[in-house]
Design a protein with these regions (language model features):
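Terminal catalytic/cofactor-binding subdomain
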Residues: 1-129, 136-138, 175
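Sequence termini and other peripheral, non-core segments
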Residues: 1-37, 41-54, 323, 327-438, ...
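Loop-rich catalytic cores of soluble enzymes, especially ATP-dependent carboxylate-amine ligases
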Residues: 8-10, 105-106, 116-134, 138, ...
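A short glycine-rich, hydrophobically flanked beta-strand micro-motif that places a catalytic Asp/Glu
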Residues: 97-102, 317-323, 561-565, 572, ...
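A long amphipathic alpha-helix within ATP-dependent nucleotide-binding catalytic cores
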Residues: 247-259, 301-304, 308, 553, ...
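ATP-binding N-terminal substructure of ATP-dependent carboxylate-amine bond-forming enzymes
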Residues: 415-480, 486-489, 508
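Active-site nucleotide/adenylate-binding loops and adjacent lid/helix of ATP-dependent enzymes
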Residues: 454, 463-469, 473-624, 673-677
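C-terminal active-site "lid" helix and adjoining low-complexity regulatory extension at the edge
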Residues: 634, 658-671, 685-689, 698-754
Length: 754
């Protein structure tokens, strides 16, 4: 079989960049002084026996972050950013993720093997510690996983002389592995970032700085007598099996190589079931990047891997790989500013890159990546190791690494209500995703714009829309709650108090109703909207003009409008989940308090600088607006937006207290009488709602409620209620709702947290 020159035969329009990617990142947990953390793996991160994204590697303090499969390098980094965010906010607030591959100053005695449930995995780690030493195990890095795209492989297969797709894929991945090991020095030269070891790491003096201790024989490598041939897949499989049989290796995974075949549980299965993808294991952590690897690196490596496929495989594989290993060792232990040695043939690599880009018509971005590679080949100061040199102080990078770790820690805790990389999604969905990752649930975003998620654990699958719309709700329930008239009728039939009023489908009908409500306190609101849109509240009798304006505002939001009696009292939002009240909020209407110096418009602008305020429900509090409704409210109180408000004077900009219209949230879950919580839960149950927001007006919360004497009125039930307002409150402790949603959906995971 020949697999050389296959890329060259493809049509220029072939999907050359099609691939699947995954990233694994190892990082040590340290304290704020840069010393190893001696705390256990965080219990909030679910059980390590099944967690798909956050594991421990060798040491108890060595976290391993694993992305799901991504269809692009950008998405892989996005996954890693989110998982890093979860990990960074799940460890103690006094702990950080170390930003270098080489550990801080350590001694062998303080390195604790990961306390895993699996007996063999514990035994295996103790075996490695005894055989290779513990300090080497604390070296961390990045593993770059890539599977060539299905359509790309099929196109290559059609150009080949093969009839067996599995044999073809094996040959293709074997060639890529061979050339990767042959040119491994390119990765070490460009991206090596382990120039020094902290004092005491090595038992003997080692010249430094270098490009990468981790990628040299001073890093984690097998004993010298372990030599595995990549000349054929059969040779590879048989060699490792023989070493295990002889007792030189304890398991297949003990064989360490810069590249590993992946996709089967045992190596021999590769022969008949095939290689699925390759794992490239020799990337140092980039401390200049919060997640340890840059977008440019991801894309440059992808291009280099394709160039390695473009190049012919070596004729004498074992000899070529031995030469490649020797060259890599030389470059890894060279000073970061030392030019490439003469035996490092860069011309064939840059030529392959140029031809690849030209043949497939890749654009300016990829042409720029090729130029960066060429420039770095010509000027070693542009390599990653060289960029670290100015930060070495007293033969140490610890201060630099600690500063970076602190900066990344602070970033993780900035806007801590959001999931990094997914900020454009609705906030409750971000919070649910954060908790799903933390608990160890698999996730897939089916439709980002529609906030539609797939979550699963083993064979158990749940679909979630907008954070709490699930299979637990009957289809008709949200439809009923979206219709305020239907909601009122169902609640009234069940014996619960609701406000009196009427429904209108035209402005003329509503205006004709004015004589009946003239002189009364009323509420005008759309029939079927959420988030408090289009609602006007008149605590004083409305003039005909203001009433007409309120009707017009409501009709802008819906084709039907309700005019109801105004119920005096304080409005509270009860969050009901599966028949139980989980949180109660007092919501204060959008308001400003005067200082005698600034106009109302300026006070609104000042209040909007609060970092908790944002737009489109992506922050816990919403930006306060000065639209028609707010200006109408001001007019009713005798003010205009450009009036200076007296010191201490509070004016409301809304009658309704929805957080979505600029209100403030106050958690009163622990202080309100439990009878109201039970009553609200009963109302939700009468609607058949699983997750529901119940809005009650309570004149005097000190009086206990009952169904016979409720001492309250239900003004609205909300399907898909916002959860973030209950967690990140303007005042009070806040109640975490999204973990309870997940516990209800996946009780088997909730009971297996360790």
């Amino acid at each position: 079989m020949t697999i050389n020159q296959l890329l060259q035969k493809l049509e220029p329009t072939s999907p050359i960049l099609q691939a699947n990617f995954g990233i694994e990142r190892e990082s040590l947990r340290v304290d704020r002084q840069g010393k190893l953390a001696h705390t256990p793996h965080p219990s909030c991160l679910g059980a390590r026996s099944f967690h798909p994204y956050i594991q421990t590697d060798f040491c108890e303090f060595q976290m391993e972050l694993i992305t799901p499969v991504a269809k692009s390098t950008t998405e892989a980094r996005r996954f890693l950013g989110a998982i890093t965010d979860v990990a960074g906010r799940s460890i103690s607030k006094d702990e950080l993720l170390w930003t270098l591959s080489m550990p801080p100053r350590i001694n062998a005695q303080e390195i604790q093997v990961a306390q895993l449930e699996n007996e063999f995995e514990r035994y295996y780690r103790n075996y490695l510690a005894e055989k290779y030493g513990t300090k080497l195990q604390a070296i961390s890095g990045i593993h770059y996983n890539m599977e060539l795209g299905k359509d790309l492989v099929e196109a290559l297969f059609q150009e080949s002389d093969q009839i067996d797709i599995i044999a073809f894929k094996n040959a293709l991945y074997l060639k890529l592995a061979q050339n990767y090991l042959r040119y491994r020095w390119v990765i070490t030269y460009l991206f090596g970032a382990a120039p020094i070891a902290e004092q005491g790491f090595f038992d003997q003096e080692v010249p430094e700085p270098v490009r990468s201790f981790r990628n040299s024989d001073h890093g984690y490598v097998n004993k010298e007598e372990i030599q595995v041939s990549f000349a054929s897949l059969e040779d590879y499989v048989s060699a490792i099996e023989n070493y295990i049989e002889q007792g030189d290796l304890i398991a297949e995974k003990e064989f360490y190589s810069a590249v590993r075949f992946r996709g089967q549980k045992v190596n021999r299965s590769f022969l008949d079931k095939g290689i699925t993808y390759l794992e490239f294991r020799n990337f140092d952590l980039n401390p200049f990047e919060r997640i340890g690897i840059s977008q440019t690196t991801m894309d440059t490596v992808h291009l280099l891997l394709l160039a390695f496929l473009w190049l012919d495989a070596p004729e004498n594989v074992d000899q070529a790989l031995a030469q490649g290993h020797a060259l890599n060792e030389k470059i890894a232990l060279s000073h970061p500013l030392e030019p490439l040695p003469s035996e490092a043939e860069t011309q064939n690599i840059t030529t392959a890159l140029d031809q690849l880009v030209q043949h497939f018509g890749l654009g300016d971005y990829h042409q720029g990546l090729v130029k960066q590679v060429k420039d770095a080949f010509a000027d070693s100061s542009q390599t990653l190791a060289a960029q670290l040199l100015p930060h070495i102080k007293d033969k140490s990078l610890s201060d630099f690494a600690l500063d970076k770790a602190l900066a990344y820690h602070d970033y993780d805790w900035t806007a801590h209500y959001a999931l990094k990389g997914y900020e454009e999604m609705e906030l409750s969905t971000q919070m649910l995703l954060f908790d799903a990752i933390q608990k160890g649930l698999h996730f897939e975003i089916l439709d980002e714009q529609d906030q539609f998620l797939k979550l699963w654990h083993k064979d158990h699958v749940e679909y979630v829309k907008n954070g709490n719309m699930t299979s637990k709700d009957n289809y008709v329930v949200p439809l009923a709650m979206a219709n305020k008239t239907v909601t009122k009728k169902i609640l009234a039939d069940a014996g619960f108090p609701v406000p009196a009023g009427d429904e209108f489908t035209s402005l003329e009908q509503g205006l004709a109703y004015y004589p009946l409500i003239k002189g009364k306190q009323i509420v005008v609101k759309p029939k079927s909207t959420n988030f408090g849109l289009g609602i006007s509240i008149f605590q004083e009798p409305a003039s005909l003009d203001n009433y007409k304006k309120a009707l017009e505002i409501a009709f802008e939001e819906d084709t039907a409008v309700l005019v109801e009696e105004f119920i005096p009292g304080t409005e509270y939002r009860f969050f009901i989940l599966d028949g139980r009240c989980e949180s109660v909020l007092l919501r204060v209407a959008a308001n400003v308090v005067g200082d005698g110096k600034h106009t109302i418009r300026e006070l609104v602008a000042q209040k909007n600088t609060n970092p908790l305020r944002g737009r489109d429900h992506r922050s816990p509090l919403e930006i306060i607006k000065l639209g028609d409704i707010e200006q109408l409210m001001l007019t009713q109180q005798g003010y205009a937006p450009d009036d200076i408000l007296p010191e201490g004077k509070k004016v409301n900009l809304r009658r309704n207290s929805n957080i979505s219209t600029g209100g403030d949230s106050i958690d009163v879950t622990e202080t309100i009488d439990s009878s109201y919580q039970e009553l609200a839960a009963a109302m939700a149950t009468s609607m058949g709602a699983w997750a529901c927001g119940v809005d009650l007006i309570i004149p005097d919360r000190t009086q206990p409620a009952s169904k016979e004497n409720p001492h309250c009125t239900c003004i609205e039930l909300n399907f898909n209620p916002s959860m973030y307002i209950h967690t990140y409150c303007a005042e009070g402790p806040g109640q975490a709702i999204t973990p309870k949603i997940l516990d209800k959906l996946f009780p088997e995971v909730a009971t297996s947290q360790t």
